Amino acid sequence: MDGIVPDIAVGTKRGSDELFSTCVSNGPFIMSSSASAANGNDSKKFKGDNRSAGVPSRVIHVRKLPSDVTEGEVISLGLPFGKVTNLLMLKGKNQAFIEMNTEEAANTMVNYYTSVAPVLRGQPIYIQFSNHKELKTDSSPNQARAQAALQAVNSVQSGNLALAASAAAVDAGMAMAGQSPVLRIIVENLFYPVTLDVLHQIFSKFGTVLKIITFTKNNQFQALLQYADPVSAQHAKLSLDGQNIYNACCTLRIDFSKLTSLNVKYNNDKSRDYTRPDLPSGDSQPSLDQTMAAAFGAPGIMSASPYAGAGFPPTFAIPQAAGLSVPNVHGALAPLAIPSAAAAAAASRIAIPGLAGAGNSVLLVSNLNPERVTPQSLFILFGVYGDVQRVKILFNKKENALVQMADGSQAQLAMSHLNGHKLHGKSVRITLSKHQSVQLPREGQEDQGLTKDYGSSPLHRFKKPGSKNFQNIFPPSATLHLSNIPPSVSEDDLKSLFSSNGGVVKGFKFFQKDRKMALIQMGSVEEAVQALIELHNHDLGENHHLRVSFSKSTI
């Protein structure tokens, strides 16, 4: 039989390298002390399961594992799909068996990895159903590490923080992973704000985050993040390394830190010890929390991906996943069963599944200039960051307005970029509204044109999923990007146009390779904001309407 496990009961004498102490067709896979040789390098013949068809089972056979793989890494393969109830490592064979809590979870796992090849330590691995319906392990020394790892992981996954924080669980996790619970995080292509609260929102889906320190080094935004245990750190690294927080930017590069613990002295927008809420802020500057925490750490943000919080690679095909239900991971919010088109559209905005914006899409905008603000001006300004659906200026409090975006992620972008900027001479304040939608006035209700529905507006910038406009979203700046300029319009024409409403034009430059585009620099950010509101979609003739957006460049 050359060491292949047969599908019939056998009663022949077994050698020391035989894997099973009991072998029954489709019965439990029983690991005993006689299997010790299979964990070493002297066992040559074991080839795992002999199968011709992938009959679903709770037990999954993993092959071609890297020789230095850890128990934690193998367990992490199954975590996004449900609870891992047992593990058998055959390191000498570069194989493992994972037992899931349900056949459904195992089936989802195998289906997923059939379409997206799993990789551990840069090496492709292979996953298939086992012939065996369950794993039964004994108390042999070879199983001690696997069981300790399982206990540590499951204690965190089930929310049993007391057990997870116990010395035994932490020690077992350290021995299992051989790694620090501290991660070093570098964010590349930082086009949008990434704050301490953004990181906490993302990384807390994989375990209990104890401390975070953020800093800038070599002109790169970096962070150190400490988990309660190395298992969570391992899981987060495997799931998030190389992923983009937002589409096509803010790429996470994650490594283990040489530090085993962080020393946080202050709780502010740069550092946080979640176990010590009593720590001082350490400076007199207002914390970014006031403007950012509501945006990115808001409760109720849900995933537009059916694999909520699972941290799948960006290669995962969203349409294939629509409607699937996968058990939550580390308290991740409930997955949504949504149409594939909606899933694909949402995925084009936010790259990490657990951060996609199906949360509150309505913003409360206050401290407006009641003499000058109009629904149209708010539509154009907020439309730089998403597709505005409705705007309502409050009838009895015209310094306040509600702006409804297409989804929660767009609302968060608009809030993070516009909060505190001046509009019509006043610094606007923006928060998430308690309302879930903006109501249109009833027929006959006095409104004075203060409520507008823009749901079908042709001026939406982000109608097409994956549009390049998603990659050109920048905070308000004095420099504006102009496009769709006809050949007959000159530099002087545009300078005259932008100074006609009292603004000062400080600089202008056509793009060398494309005179349909240009940069124009106004006297201040406030002037640029006003110019964008007044001149976006301005008719330049020849069937050309000017497109205006904020630029990250200067002249």
UniProtKB/Swiss-Prot annotation:
<dbReference type="InterPro" id="IPR035001">
    <property type="entry name" value="PTBP1_RRM3"/>
</dbReference>
<feature type="domain" description="RRM 2">
    <location>
        <begin position="183"/>
        <end position="259"/>
    </location>
</feature>
<keyword id="KW-0010">Activator</keyword>
<feature type="domain" description="RRM 1">
    <location>
        <begin position="58"/>
        <end position="142"/>
    </location>
</feature>
<keyword id="KW-0597">Phosphoprotein</keyword>
<dbReference type="InterPro" id="IPR035000">
    <property type="entry name" value="PTBP1_RRM1"/>
</dbReference>
<comment type="function">
    <text>Plays a role in pre-mRNA splicing and in the regulation of alternative splicing events. Activates exon skipping of its own pre-mRNA during muscle cell differentiation. Binds to the polypyrimidine tract of introns. May promote RNA looping when bound to two separate polypyrimidine tracts in the same pre-mRNA. May promote the binding of U2 snRNP to pre-mRNA. Cooperates with RAVER1 to modulate switching between mutually exclusive exons during maturation of the TPM1 pre-mRNA. Represses the splicing of MAPT/Tau exon 10.</text>
</comment>
<keyword id="KW-0677">Repeat</keyword>
<feature type="domain" description="RRM 4">
    <location>
        <begin position="478"/>
        <end position="553"/>
    </location>
</feature>
<dbReference type="GO" id="GO:0010467">
    <property type="term" value="P:gene expression"/>
</dbReference>
<keyword id="KW-0007">Acetylation</keyword>
<dbReference type="GO" id="GO:0003723">
    <property type="term" value="F:RNA binding"/>
</dbReference>
<feature type="cross-link" description="Glycyl lysine isopeptide (Lys-Gly) (interchain with G-Cter in SUMO2)">
    <location>
        <position position="217"/>
    </location>
</feature>
<dbReference type="InterPro" id="IPR035979">
    <property type="entry name" value="RBD_domain_sf"/>
</dbReference>
<keyword id="KW-0539">Nucleus</keyword>
<dbReference type="InterPro" id="IPR021790">
    <property type="entry name" value="PTBP1-like_RRM2"/>
</dbReference>
<dbReference type="GO" id="GO:0000381">
    <property type="term" value="P:regulation of alternative mRNA splicing, via spliceosome"/>
</dbReference>
<feature type="modified residue" description="Phosphoserine">
    <location>
        <position position="16"/>
    </location>
</feature>
<dbReference type="InterPro" id="IPR012677">
    <property type="entry name" value="Nucleotide-bd_a/b_plait_sf"/>
</dbReference>
<dbReference type="InterPro" id="IPR000504">
    <property type="entry name" value="RRM_dom"/>
</dbReference>
<dbReference type="GO" id="GO:0045665">
    <property type="term" value="P:negative regulation of neuron differentiation"/>
</dbReference>
<comment type="subunit">
    <text>Monomer. Part of a ternary complex containing KHSRP, PTBP1, PTBP2 and HNRPH1. Interacts with SFPQ. Interacts with RAVER1. Interacts with IVNS1ABP (via BACK domain); the interaction is direct.</text>
</comment>
<feature type="modified residue" description="Phosphothreonine">
    <location>
        <position position="137"/>
    </location>
</feature>
<keyword id="KW-0678">Repressor</keyword>
<feature type="region of interest" description="Disordered">
    <location>
        <begin position="435"/>
        <end position="457"/>
    </location>
</feature>
<feature type="modified residue" description="Phosphoserine">
    <location>
        <position position="457"/>
    </location>
</feature>
<dbReference type="Pfam" id="PF00076">
    <property type="entry name" value="RRM_1"/>
</dbReference>
<keyword id="KW-0832">Ubl conjugation</keyword>
<dbReference type="InterPro" id="IPR006536">
    <property type="entry name" value="HnRNP-L/PTB"/>
</dbReference>
<dbReference type="GO" id="GO:0022008">
    <property type="term" value="P:neurogenesis"/>
</dbReference>
<keyword id="KW-1017">Isopeptide bond</keyword>
<keyword id="KW-0507">mRNA processing</keyword>
<dbReference type="GO" id="GO:0051148">
    <property type="term" value="P:negative regulation of muscle cell differentiation"/>
</dbReference>
<dbReference type="GO" id="GO:0045944">
    <property type="term" value="P:positive regulation of transcription by RNA polymerase II"/>
</dbReference>
<feature type="cross-link" description="Glycyl lysine isopeptide (Lys-Gly) (interchain with G-Cter in SUMO2)">
    <location>
        <position position="64"/>
    </location>
</feature>
<dbReference type="GO" id="GO:0075522">
    <property type="term" value="P:IRES-dependent viral translational initiation"/>
</dbReference>
<dbReference type="GO" id="GO:0006397">
    <property type="term" value="P:mRNA processing"/>
</dbReference>
<feature type="modified residue" description="Phosphoserine">
    <location>
        <position position="140"/>
    </location>
</feature>
<feature type="domain" description="RRM 3">
    <location>
        <begin position="361"/>
        <end position="412"/>
    </location>
</feature>
<dbReference type="GO" id="GO:0005634">
    <property type="term" value="C:nucleus"/>
</dbReference>
<dbReference type="GO" id="GO:0008380">
    <property type="term" value="P:RNA splicing"/>
</dbReference>
<keyword id="KW-0508">mRNA splicing</keyword>
